[in-house]
Regions:
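C-terminal output helix
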Residues: 116-125
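Active-site beta3 strand of CheY-like receiver
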Residues: 54-60
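Active-site residues of response regulator receiver
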Residues: 18, 62, 92
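Receiver (REC) domain active-site loop signature in two-component systems and cognate sites
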Residues: 65
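Short hydrophobic/Thr-rich beta-strand motif most characteristic of the beta2 strand and flanking loop
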Residues: 35-42, 50
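Charged docking surfaces used in two-component/phosphorelay signaling
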Residues: 25-33
Length: 133
């Protein structure tokens, strides 16, 4: 995301990963006004395919998904030299310490719990993108 002086920065690519369409749509509505290029995946497996093809700048990753859950996806991403630099923001309705610790150990940089607040979500997204810029 480093941009030479005088060159307009390309919008950040944000991958939203959730098996529930309503959650993906809600995140799209919250993030669209900030001009991000939004990618979506409906499963952990699909997320890994998209990451391999499009290398997003940030991943918003729900924990509770059938098949490969968010913890497993984060661990795979952070275990790969090609993707370990991509920040992962885990989104969950689980607000207990063990879930957060498990996510951080899997490699997530941050957590947000439902119900999501647009201002907090957008601030966290901008913060994580700044940290990797």
């Amino acid at each position: 995301m480093n941009t030479p002086p005088g060159v307009a920065a390309a919008p950040a690519r944000v991958l939203i990963v959730d098996d529930e369409r309503h959650n993906r749509q809600l995140l799209e509505v919250m993030l669209e006004p900030d001009g991000y290029v939004l990618l979506t995946a409906t499963s952990g497996e699909e997320a890994l395919e998209i990451v391999a093809q499009q290398l997003p700048d940030l991943i918003l990753l729900y924990i509770m998904m059938p098949g490969m859950d968010g913890y497993q996806v984060a661990a795979r991403l952070k275990g790969d030299l090609a993707t370990r630099h991509i920040p992962v923001l885990m989104l969950t309705s689980l607000d207990d310490r063990n879930s957060k610790v498990h996510g951080l150990r899997a490699g997530a940089e941050a957590f947000l719990t439902k119900p999501l607040n647009r201002a907090e979500l957008c601030a966290r997204v901008k913060q994580l993108l700044r940290e990797v810029a």
